[in-house]
Amino acid sequence: MTETGIVQRPWGWFETIGAGEGYLVKRLCIEAGHRLSLQRHRHRLEHWVVVSGSGQLECEGSTIHAEAGTTLLVPHGAVHRAAATTENLLIVEVQRGEHLSEDDIERLADDYERMKC
């Protein structure tokens, strides 16, 4: 089941803005000075499009500067994260795959101690 409305997280918030068979579209706001957990997904790929703000996007050990217009394709199983620097980072995330839920997150490192034992 897809969560609707704004969902608060320690790093900011997200909301689902569209969904259909095999895809889910979210808007993520990572607050200045915060970052997502270092994570990977087994059942989906993600395509990130930065729409405002600045920060860094990491994928498989490479880091790129993020600003409006920056895009990143995160393949199935790729280790990745996004971080906001001095201003909020707004990302539109398109997920594609067979299992599109918050259960498909394997956290490898997390600033907010949300890793499962």
Question: What is the predicted role of each segment?
Answer:
Residues 2-9, 81, 85-117:
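Double-stranded beta-helix
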Residues 3-40, 44-45:
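A short glycine-rich, His/Asp/Glu-containing loop-to-beta-strand
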Residues 34, 43-44, 62, 78, ...:
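A generic "binding-loop/recognition-motif" signal
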Residues 43-56, 60-61:
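Glycine- and acidic-residue-biased ligand/ion/polar-headgroup-sensing regions
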Residues 61-79:
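Short acidic-glycine-tyrosine-enriched beta hairpin
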